[in-house]
Amino acid sequence: MGVVSSQSFKNLISTYAGFSIGALNVLILYPYFLSQEYYGLVTFLLSAANLFWPFMAAGFHNAIIRFYSAYQKKEDKDSFLSFALIVPLITGSIIGLASWWLYDYILAYFSDKNQLIQPYAWLIVPLGVLNAYFEVFYSWAKVFLKSVFGNLMKEIFHRVAITILLGLLYYEWIAIENFIYYLALIYLLRVIVIGIYALQVYSPKFQLRLLYNYKLVLSYSSLILLAGFIAVALFDLDKVMIEYYMPVENVPVYGIAVYIAAVIAVPVKAMNQIAKPLTASYINEDKLDQLEDLYQRSSITLLIISGFIFLLIICNLDQIYAIIPEEYRGGYKVVIWIGLIKVVDNLLGNGG
């Protein structure tokens, strides 16, 4: 547990730092610096992009963690990573072409209500591709037990950049109409940085050759694609559905409540960045005793931490909502129910 404890602690610090900066953005800067409609637009676009990226990654971000340590030959490892690099490009191109062909129908979908989304709807697919590539490169680094920098990029980088962007908007150095485009550039820059880092950790010789276990990889990736979409859908589909049934300004009301409850998930997220690659390694090397010990320790530790955080949030929920503009309040029950779900996620430990 030495490597797990060390990197989990560093990831926990960076993740909570990221959540703190995110809380500043979500609870204070967004509500006060953006209109409720534009805040809803930002929440909707990012949530919609999150629904697409599991299809674009096609499960390969998890397949890297699961199978990389199983390959013994450099040629197999390089070919495997090469496939992982081109998969988001292929799937993103297919989805992008389909979106282009259906673009008029997409615009018509937003014509009756929420017309504010129309000029920015095309950004959903590129943002999805960027998220997919980020996860692939991050998994790339994690299999070499280099999770700390990637976690900084995942949790802190874009949130700090968004804080700066909101400051520029407040001082009218950028126009509100261009805010979304600058936001997309932040996600592009994040992918470039993590991509350079991953290639510095290990730079494969690009080659595409049929892997001896390609059927197993494809079946696992397909399963992860489905599981990954369900996991993301549980977090973001509701925000997209709210846009469908209600005006877009209702999206951030729900989004704020979800964000408050999501703080409870930070411990398990931090531990999984390093524990998941170790789990795959133990499975591949048939070290079942060590795997069982890892599961038990992670479950007990995460339950204690997450339970404490849940109680802390519930006991101070009135004070938290007091700092938010009145029109964004009203998600008390959402915080409680989603918070309980996050505690259960932590209880499952690394096995979840």
Regions from the language model: what does each represent?
Residues 3-62, 92-100, 127, 163, ...:
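Signature of the first transmembrane helix
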Residues 46-54, 231, 254-273, 305-309, ...:
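Transmembrane helix-bundle signature of multi-pass secondary active exporters and lipid flippases
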Residues 5, 130-154, 339-352:
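Membrane-interface junctions at transmembrane-helix termini in multi-pass inner-membrane proteins
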Residues 1-4, 116, 176-182, 192-235, ...:
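Interhelical loop/hinge segments that connect adjacent transmembrane helices in multipass membrane
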Residues 122, 152-200, 220, 258:
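Hydrophobic alpha-helical transmembrane segments
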Residues 105-124, 248, 313-345, 349:
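Interfacial segments at transmembrane-helix termini and the short loops linking adjacent helices
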Residues 57-72, 143, 257, 261-299, ...:
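Helix-loop junctions and terminal segments of transmembrane helices
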Residues 6-18, 45, 54-104, 119-122, ...:
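Membrane-water interface segments that mark the loop-to-transmembrane alpha-helix transition
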